């Protein structure tokens, strides 16, 4: 298992000119969910990423890797800001692998998702909320 450490996401945003620094916030000892967030004065307004890996159980035979992104927004279009969340954007990605999957198969799924998210059809669907036809 990798040690929880700071992550820098660069080249993000619509124009690719945003950098986000995520700092480790700890691992929940009960469920093993690792949390990272942007340093901020108001915790509710911090951008947050959580990562968890669930082991197979008697009833569930697959490993489950979940990555969740939460981006709260505190300002209105007019630029008026207050210390409360006006809305949040979320992403929830779940990967499922059998215990017999190889690291090559898992890497293929991860890189396929990366390439898929760079495709113009998905960019239009996510950024502009336009469905495929």
Swiss-Prot record:
A GO MF label: RNA binding
Q: Which domain of life is it from?
A: Viruses
- What is this protein's function per UniProt? Capsid protein self-assembles to form an icosahedral capsid with a T=3 symmetry, about 26 nm in diameter, and consisting of 89 capsid proteins dimers (178 capsid proteins). Involved in viral genome encapsidation through the interaction between a capsid protein dimer and the multiple packaging signals present in the RNA genome. Binding of the capsid proteins to the viral RNA induces a conformational change required for efficient T=3 shell formation. The capsid also contains 1 copy of the A2 maturation protein.
Q: Where in the cell is it found?
A: Virion
Provide the assembly information.
Homodimer. The capsid protein dimer binds to the viral RNA via an operator hairpin, but also many other RNA sequences in the viral genome.
Site RNA-binding: list residues.
90
Q: What is the lineage of its organism?
A: Viruses, Riboviria, Orthornavirae, Lenarviricota, Leviviricetes
Principal subcellular localisation of the protein: virion
Q: Which organism is it from?
A: Qbeta virus (strain MX1)
Q: What is this protein called?
A: Capsid protein
GO terms in the biological process aspect are: regulation of translation
Q: Which family does it belong to?
A: Belongs to the Leviviricetes capsid protein family.
Example GO CC term: the record gives:
T=3 icosahedral viral capsid
Q: Which UniProt keywords apply?
A: Capsid protein, RNA-binding, T=3 icosahedral capsid protein, Translation regulation, Virion
InterPro entries from the entry? Levivir_coat, Phage_RNA-type_capsid
Q: Is Flavoprotein given among the entry's keywords?
A: no
Would the keyword Endoplasmic reticulum be found if you checked this record's keyword annotation? no
